[in-house]
Amino acid sequence: MERENTVFAEELNPTFLFMWKGTRVEDEPNYHCHEHLELCYIQSGTGKHRIGDTIYEVKEGDLLVINEGVYHQSLAGEHKTPVAEFYVGLTDLNLAGLGRNHFPLPGNCPVFRTEGELQRKLSKLCMAMEAEQELCRIGRYYMMKTYAMQMLLLLLREEEETGKPQKAGGCSFESANRKYLVEKITDYFEDHYAEKISLDRIAGNMYLSTFY
């Protein structure tokens, strides 16, 4: 039977290793690699990451996917402004057609520029994982593993939906105009829920006609 839009359980059943959250104000001392897959979500601030032979500028909402054996180093940037980083370590990931602990990278770019709904979902997963670690309740490992797997699945779904469009300096998940506008309108409702909202006001803020 042909495999179509399906991730088999034996492929996406990684071992959860760790999560770590910290604020970086100095360069990471070592240019290094791991024998596991590492995710780094930028929760706030701006900085730089050296991944392979390329230095990427990173900002809030970016998700870095560092495959096994890839050398990398977190850099604070010229102004050394604080960068809040959230790391997740996984191993035993075996996706079809890829090496062990390798995740597909559109255009071979390890930096995913997330925004809108995807960014909100990733942020919530990071917060849920952090809360689970602090609670130390029964089944903590499996809860944290589930959250990490959701992060990977969200990326796979976005790659499938958007056809892997590119943006300079990273992989953008901005899709068709309609989806983009829906996300912007949703953001507007969340920011102004306590105010009186009219169609004219929404259209004015979105630079749209009320007919559209």
Language-model segments: which ranges?
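A generic fold-level signal
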Residues: E11-N13, H34, V58, K80-P82, ...
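Amphipathic alpha-helical segments enriched in hydrophobic/aromatic residues interleaved with Lys/Arg
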Residues: H102-Q150, L154, D187
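N-terminal positioning helix adjacent to the helix-turn-helix/winged-helix DNA-binding module
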Residues: L118, E174-I185
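Basic/polar phosphate-binding segments, predominantly the helix-turn-helix DNA-binding elements
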Residues: K184, Y188-Y212
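Short, locally clustered residues in the helix-turn-helix/winged-helix DNA-binding domain
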Residues: Q43, L156, E190-A194
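Generic protein-terminus/edge-of-domain signal
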Residues: M1-L63, V70, A76-E78, N94, ...
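Linker/hinge segments immediately adjacent to helix-turn-helix/homeobox DNA-binding domains
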Residues: L152-G170
